[in-house]
């Protein structure tokens, strides 16, 4: 009887593992080149990213940049392509690499698309990395 119970439990465990679907948020790579020059963009946007969780913040990882604390470069979450409304606080990036949690100040919903905006107010800034809404 004990052997049969172990077999049944093992079979159930295998079936659960086979049909379990891992849930991971959509991670989008970004690369921004911003500048205050007349012929340059002072802000740029990532591609649309699908929000797949109910967290109250977005996650941004800067993997390479020329950012310093004097650059006055900010990240913000905005709506999908065509919607330039801000959905989060603006967070100033102050280091060449790092992780930023950007908290939402408006309702956001799982299943909707959002974009990351990078904006400079002072100097030429290049930054790249990945983010998830």
What are these regions (language model features)?
Residues 1-4, 77:
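Short alpha-helical segments used as structural interaction elements across diverse proteins
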């Amino acid at each position: 009887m004990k052997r049969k119970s172990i077999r049944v439990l093992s079979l159930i465990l295998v079936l659960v593992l086979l049909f379990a679907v891992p849930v991971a948020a959509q991670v989008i790579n970004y690369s921004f080149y911003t500048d205050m020059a007349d012929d340059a963009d002072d802000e740029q946007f990532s591609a649309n990213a699908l929000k797949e969780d109910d967290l109250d913040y977005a996650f941004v990882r800067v993997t390479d940049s020329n950012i310093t604390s004097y650059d006055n470069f900010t990240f913000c979450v905005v709506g999908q392509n065509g919607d330039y409304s801000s959905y989060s606080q603006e967070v100033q990036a102050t280091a060449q690499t790092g992780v930023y949690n950007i908290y939402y100040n408006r309702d956001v919903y799982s299943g909707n698309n959002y974009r990351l905006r990078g904006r400079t107010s002072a100097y030429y800034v290049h930054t790249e990395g990945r983010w998830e809404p």
